[in-house]
């Protein structure tokens, strides 16, 4: 019987995919197809919630099949991330886009990311205090116990890692290993490796222009192929969003969410406040924040459904270049740095809130100015090297809690609402990287304001 029900659910999903394909054939705009997929995915997931239990075998098996579309799409995006970073940043050097302002661009983007992460920590602290969020009364069931065991194992691996050690881990010792994404800091390491190649190209160009020109032509060909791959993958976005949203909603445990409702509400209030701060920073830079919101919303929608900052990176770069008018070099740097440095949601708001929740259990007053200032500083510094894939927030929380000498068990006790909160955190992470790129581009005078102010419904070649 279960097999029949699963088959029906999968058949309905395939019909919905067919509807999206029909919309594509009728040249419905890319943004409209993404929003349609989001809405239909939520409705389909709610219907499955109503018919079955979230933990039923039918839902679990159906979600496994839905994952072929949703998770498969995310994996394709992750596949292209490292090649995209490598060729894009080297290409920025060969096109003389970064040679004069490399240090200024990097410093400004990283500075904005770290600053906004510190602000995000303060927002998380305020939300925790305002909603009186506490770890008292949280119960440890089987799922929490299993998660706690994994958390303790992970904590053991990072317990003795100092901040200087973390900074050293950003440097690539084996760039080929980092191209596989094997380390949490692989993204930044690939950026550094690509920058070294770009700097070397500039030196070779001065002494051996013929060899440099040959390298440039080869790189241009590779760049064109990689960007074509990006375009092909991004065209699958509506299908990925549909499957991911249906899977997430169908598998969410409403009762568990209600038990931690205060924490969920406080988290989303903090996330929304921080997003408004992004818009205020954009407005203070002399740009229309509403225009920004309209143009990046499809990217944030995908980040929300996929829960992967790294997976959203190709969309992130494409939107920065084609919709916001940010120069190619700055767009690539902002998106690349934003995956591993200064994640406002996962490395800012989340660890700060957990620290505020658990501090009273060890006799610390979380509202003491010294504790708050120390926590903000620790959160900002610890945001270096947080992976832009699932588990990054846990990694950040463990570092912050251990540095503040606080119990780490709280990380396991909120597992039941982790997917729901992670969706909002990831969207904020991506918004933070795009905000850093936009503000940096504006301040350095490299923003194409005509492109930024232009109303459109397409993202480059994606919609075609």
Swiss-Prot record:
Q: Which SUPFAM superfamilies match?
A: Proton glutamate symport protein (SSF118215)
Recorded topology in the membrane? Multi-pass membrane protein
Sorted keywords for this record are: Amino-acid transport, Membrane, Transmembrane, Transmembrane helix, Transport
The protein's location, in the record's own words, is:
Membrane
Pfam families, from UniProt? SDF
Transmembrane annotation, as ranges: 3-23, 34-54, 73-93, 107-127, 184-204, 225-245, 263-283, 347-367, 371-391, 395-415
Which Gene3D superfamilies does the UniProt entry name for this protein?
Sodium:dicarboxylate symporter
Q: Which InterPro entries match?
A: Na-dicarboxylate_symporter, Na:dicarbo_symporter_sf
Answer whether the UniProt record assigns the keyword Transcription to this protein. no
Q: Which GO terms describe its cellular component?
A: plasma membrane
The task this protein performs is described as: Mediates uptake of L-cystine, the oxidized form of L-cysteine.
Family per record: Belongs to the dicarboxylate/amino acid:cation symporter (DAACS) (TC 2.A.23) family.
Q: Write down what this protein is called.
A: L-cystine uptake protein TcyP
Question: Which species is this record about?
Answer: Bacillus cereus (strain ATCC 10987 / NRS 248)
């Amino acid at each position: 019987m279960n097999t029949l029900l699963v088959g029906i659910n999968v058949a309905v999903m395939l019909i919905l995919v067919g509807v999206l394909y029909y919309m594509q054939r009728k040249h419905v705009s890319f943004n409209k197809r993404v929003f349609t997929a989001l809405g239909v995915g939520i409705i389909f997931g709610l219907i499955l919630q109503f018919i079955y239990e979230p933990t039923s075998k039918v839902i679990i098996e159906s979600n496994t099949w839905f994952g072929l579309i949703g998770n498969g799409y995310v994996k394709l995006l992750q596949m292209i991330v490292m090649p995209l970073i490598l060729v894009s940043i080297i290409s920025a050097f060969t096109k003389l886009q970064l040679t004069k302002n490399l240090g200024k661009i990097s410093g400004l983007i990283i500075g904005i990311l770290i600053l906004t992460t510190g602000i995000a920590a303060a927002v998380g602290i305020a939300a925790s205090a305002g909603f009186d969020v506490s770890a008292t009364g949280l119960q440890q069931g089987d799922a929490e116990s299993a998660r706690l065991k994994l958390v303790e194992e992970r904590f053991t691996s990072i317990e003795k890692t100092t901040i200087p050690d973390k900074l050293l881990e950003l440097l690539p010792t084996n760039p080929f290993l980092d191209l596989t994404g094997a380390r949490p800091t692989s993204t930044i390491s690939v950026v550094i490796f690509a920058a070294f190649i770009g700097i070397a190209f500039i030196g070779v160009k001065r002494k051996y222009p013929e060899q440099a020109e040959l390298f440039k032509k080869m790189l241009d060909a590779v760049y064109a192929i990689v960007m074509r791959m990006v375009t092909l993958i991004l065209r699958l976005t509506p299908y990925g969003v549909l499957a991911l949203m249906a899977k997430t909603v169908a598998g969410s445990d409403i009762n568990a969410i209600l038990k931690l409702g205060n924490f969920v509400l406080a988290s989303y209030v903090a996330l929304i406040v921080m997003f408004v701060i992004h818009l205020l920073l954009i407005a203070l830079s002399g740009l229309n924040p509403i225009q920004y919101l309209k143009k990046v919303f499809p990217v944030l929608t995908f980040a929300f459904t996929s829960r992967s900052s790294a997976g959203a990176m190709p969309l992130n770069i494409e939107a920065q270049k084609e919709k916001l008018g940010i120069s190619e070099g700055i767009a690539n740097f902002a998106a690349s740095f934003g995956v591993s440095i200064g994640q406002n949601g996962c490395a800012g708001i989340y660890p700060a809130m957990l620290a505020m929740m658990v501090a009273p259990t060890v006799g610390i007053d979380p509202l003491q100015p010294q504790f708050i200032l120390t926590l903000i500083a620790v959160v900002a510094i610890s945001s270096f090297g947080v992976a832009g894939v699932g588990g990054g927030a846990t990694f950040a929380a463990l570092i912050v809690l251990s540095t503040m000498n606080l119990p780490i068990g709280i990380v396991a006790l909120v597992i039941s609402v982790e997917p729901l909160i992670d969706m909002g955190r990831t969207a904020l992470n991506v918004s933070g990287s795009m905000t850093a790129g936009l503000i940096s581009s504006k301040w350095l005078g490299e923003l194409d304001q005509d492109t930024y102010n232009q109303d459109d419904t397409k993202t480059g070649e994606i919609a075609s």
